[in-house]
Regions:
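Short, low-complexity N-terminal intrinsically disordered segments enriched in polar/charged residues
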Residues: 2-49
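A solvent-exposed, acidic/Ser-Thr-rich amphipathic alpha-helical stretch
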Residues: 49-119
Length: 174
């Protein structure tokens, strides 16, 4: 399951049955807060069991299978990533990063065949660690689904504005 931005058509503020822009915005702000507060186990719980998390390495990349990606995780790899972030021995996070995310321009796109909705938003992420500050910006595409009465992430695609630029290690989830 992948999300191709060229196939996502915005539907502005219309609702897709169970979901409207306000509810999507609340969910995305909640996700950003969990990440900024390093509550990674709670963040992981937002994903479905068959979820994918994808950060393409090329602008407009249509598939994670055709070329290398900055990140392409299934649920199992996400669990490993979260375990590493929780470890006191993760050298790349000594001291731990402090982050601040801004999520904006939230819009609903066409509902998927599974009844889930694709939500598009813009983001800015600032990561501070030691004396360094890094800035990331781009577009999120979330395919959301309802599981056991709660909104869950079935797919998250992160299109970085500078995805094809050289980068130091990417440890913190976007």
């Amino acid at each position: 399951m992948t999300l191709n931005p060229q196939r996502v058509r915005a539907s502005s503020t219309t609702a897709h049955g169970w979901l409207d822009v306000g509810r999507c915005e609340d969910f995305l702000v909640h996700e950003a807060r969990l990440l900024d507060e390093a509550r990674f186990d709670e963040w992981l719980a937002l994903f479905t069991e068959d979820a994918r998390y994808w950060v393409p390495s090329e602008p407009g990349q249509a598939s994670p299978h055709d070329t290398v990606s900055l990140m392409y995780d299934d649920r199992r790899l996400l669990e490993t990533r979260v375990r590493r972030l929780a470890s006191p021995r993760i050298y790349s996070q000594e001291p731990r990063s402090r982050t601040s995310r801004i999520v904006t321009n939230v819009s609903l796109a066409d509902a998927g065949p599974d009844g889930g909705s694709v939500v598009r938003s813009k983001f800015v992420l600032i990561e501070c660690r030691r004396e360094q500050q890094r800035l990331f910006a781009g577009t999120y595409f979330h395919r959301l689904a309802v599981r056991d009465g709660a909104i869950r992430i079935a797919m998250k695609r992160v299109d970085l504005v500078n995805c094809d630029a050289p980068m130091d290690g990417l440890v913190i989830p976007f």
